[in-house]
């Protein structure tokens, strides 16, 4: 049972990426779905945040201050 489910899931993923090679917009959407680096919460005002290029982690906006980034209301 588990083996057939795993095979079925792998087939869907492979088909999706094969289809995405033809359609660049679908590839972008698949990459966003596959990424699992976004938290289930947002970082509050005044707290440090990672580089905004790595994802939108702030409740408001992540702005640079020197070499670090902070969540600010802008």
UniProtKB/Swiss-Prot annotation:
It comes from the Eukaryota. Residues 1-20 form the signal peptide. GO terms for cellular component: extracellular region. Keywords: Disulfide bond, Knottin, Secreted, Signal. Expressed by the venom gland. It is found in: Secreted. Disulfide bonds join 42-59, 49-62, 58-71. Residues 21-39 form a propeptide. The presence of a 'disulfide through disulfide knot' structurally defines this protein as a knottin. This is U2-sicaritoxin-Sdo1a.
């Amino acid at each position: 049972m588990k083996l057939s489910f795993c095979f079925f899931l792998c087939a869907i993923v492979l088909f999706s990426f094969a289809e995405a090679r033809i359609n660049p917009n679908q590839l972008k959407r698949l990459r966003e779905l596959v990424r699992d680096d976004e938290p289930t919460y947002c970082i509050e005002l005044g707290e440090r945040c990672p580089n905004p290029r790595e994802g939108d982690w702030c409740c408001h906006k992540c702005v640079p201050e020197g070499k670090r980034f902070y969540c600010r209301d802008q």
